[in-house]
Amino acid sequence: MDMILYIPYDFPFVMDEGMSRFISQYVDGNYLEGYTWKMSINGLECTNCQSPEDASKRDLADFNQIEISGKFDLRILRQDHYSVELNGPEHEKEQYTVRRSGETLIIDFNRNKNFDWDVKGLTLEEMKITITMPTIEKIEAVGLGNIRFEDFTSDDLEIEVRGPVKIRGEINAHNLIIKLTGKSEADLSGNTNNLNARIEFASRLRAYHLQAQDAFVEVSGASSAKVNVSGTLEMDEGVASDIDYRGNPQIIRHD
């Protein structure tokens, strides 16, 4: 027996998987139970399904770590909501993949992972990126550019930078871990109970305005660090490297 079902235009209805099989138009199985549909002159339409843009915004939330590569000017703002905005030429945007993996927001430059970011006259255009998030626990950056953040409070924060990237920020953290390599620079202010810094390969840490209770600082490969410590400062200075300090700490030197 053949049967034709007529549905008035703009009349809302719901359907299950069985009903969807009788409809010639493609229906996404993820939008059956709990979703409302209507028939328009353009065909079947879902009235409460998420648009691809809404789904993308939903996916780019609930992160507390950032992993970024490329040539960028990144600003991280403390807000109660999550957002990610890339501003730059479309042909440059196409070279980046933005996604979330667990609690990590990943902004990945799609070219060769062994790209030499220290090449003079690099022709890549800078991507301006703004991220808002409530808290932050880790920043990992590879490439060339600038990172700025301020007014964050964390139990633990890890900053790892590889390549000629300059990072500037204000942070209050119980434990702060810093790893700089490959001509990277960090200028930090705020407060921390425990600072652990490893600076190498012509990198620089400027942290006179970061009040640290205790610190372990290791520099090597023509690198330098300036720190402000009031308790115990453990120092490991390599060849052609230098650690300057303020705060009258107890010094423990490692050979």
PLM ranges: what are they?
Residues 233-255:
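Leucine-rich solenoid repeat scaffolds
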Residues 206-210:
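Outer-membrane beta-barrel transmembrane domain signature
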